């Protein structure tokens, strides 16, 4: 592996990242980034968190939920996937919003364009705190009325892969997908 790296025998991919800015009472309380996902989650197990999502300054929905996942295509096969989100191919530039265990009729994942500005606000007068996590790192607590804004970062992450296998092959291997269906090769011609 080291020899291949030294010989530059690898494939380089630029992966989209997210810029995450949290504010409360008009002042910035956190600025960071994420390669996979940023999440806003409830701090206390016994309560739901009331969150409002806005896209480009327009309200989308308010949910009583355990939180939301905001993911890149790289993160679409991680926490966002486990929460019910779709797989997004890594060469697609998009931002994915996935509510976590939302109590609402409209609680479906939403795929946004890469230049969208996504905001998530902890509804004022809500009991309890939200917590922002970036790629599994606890970033900041969000009191009621605080919000995060998430946009595509101008700085991608460059990844070196030793395999030039197409994403489909890597996806099948990662999730051990059955490419022959649940009945195996039962549909092949048996003549």
Task: Name every feature range the model reports, one short phrase each.
Residues 1-66:
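Catalytic core of DAGKc-family lipid kinases
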Residues 62-106:
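Gly/Ser/Thr-rich active-site loops/lids in small-molecule metabolic enzymes
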Residues 23, 40-41, 54-56, 71, ...:
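Short beta-strand-to-turn element immediately C-terminal to the catalytic PLP-Schiff-base lysine
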Residues 40, 56-59, 107-191:
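ATP/nucleoside-binding phosphotransfer catalytic cores, i.e., glycine-rich phosphate-binding loops
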Residues 22-24, 42-44, 72-76, 101-102, ...:
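Glycine-rich beta-alpha junction loops
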Residues 33-35, 100-103, 129-133:
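Short Pro/Gly-enriched beta-strand edge/turn motifs at strand-loop
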Residues 14-18, 34-36, 47-51, 66-68, ...:
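A generic structural signal for short beta-strands and their flanking turns/coil linkers
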């Amino acid at each position: 592996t080291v020899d291949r790296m030294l010989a530059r025998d690898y494939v380089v991919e630029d992966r989209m990242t997210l810029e995450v800015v949290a504010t409360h009472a008009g002042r910035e309380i956190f600025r960071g980034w994420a390669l996979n996902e940023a999440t806003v989650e409830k701090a206390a197990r016994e309560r739901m968190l009331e969150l409002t999502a806005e896209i480009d300054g327009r309200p989308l929905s308010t949910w009583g939920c355990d939180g939301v996942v905001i993911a890149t295509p790289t993160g679409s096969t991680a926490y966002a996937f486990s929460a019910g989100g779709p797989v997004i191919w890594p060469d697609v530039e998009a931002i994915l919003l996935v509510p976590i265990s939302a109590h609402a009729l409209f609680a479906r994942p939403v795929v946004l364009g890469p230049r969208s500005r996504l905001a998530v606000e902890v509804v004022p007068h809500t009991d309890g705190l939200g917590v922002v996590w970036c790629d599994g790192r606890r970033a900041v607590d969000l009191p009621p009325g605080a919000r995060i804004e998430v946009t595509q970062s101008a700085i991608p992450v460059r990844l070196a892969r030793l395999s030039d296998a197409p994403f489909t092959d890597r996806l099948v291997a990662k999730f051990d997908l059955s490419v022959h269906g649940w009945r195996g090769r039962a549909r092949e011609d048996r003549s």
